């Protein structure tokens, strides 16, 4: 039995082979999504990162094999702005960069939502994030 696509006119090259589900427009079907859950320094002041998939099933440490997958778009890595290990004061930067508000329709007011900052690979620098048109390596970004 052939897998059924949710959109019949979708070309075969628009569905990733590495993902089990059909393409549905949901980001979870396009790439594996990971979040940095912890970024601590060891005794030698080297950054130790712990990531977790969006499914929340297991904690991982980034491996060199993940870099090509990140570059090819097979996986996506994000840092939540609520992460306590961030060294940069994100308060004003995140609000200025993108006013992310959710209107609370049950008359309790406007609430600020957390934002996810994408992590990307830059040649010569390694894993990086960008805020206010400035690129930070993860080593600079975390305490």
Swiss-Prot record:
- Would you kindly state one Gene Ontology biological process term found in this protein's UniProt entry? photosynthesis
Region Disordered, as annotated, extends over 1-25
Protein name, entry field: P840 reaction center 17 kDa protein
Q: Cite the InterPro entries for this sequence.
A: PSI_P840_PscD
Assembly and interaction partners: Component of the P840 reaction center.
Does Electron transport show up as a keyword for this record? yes
Which source organism? Chlorobaculum thiosulfatiphilum (Chlorobium limicola f.sp. thiosulfatophilum)
In which domain of life is the source organism classified? Answer: Bacteria
What UniProt keywords apply to this chain's record, in alphabetical order?
Electron transport, Photosynthesis, Reaction center, Transport
KW Protein biosynthesis (keyword) present: no
What spans are recorded as compositionally biased (Polar residues)? 1-23
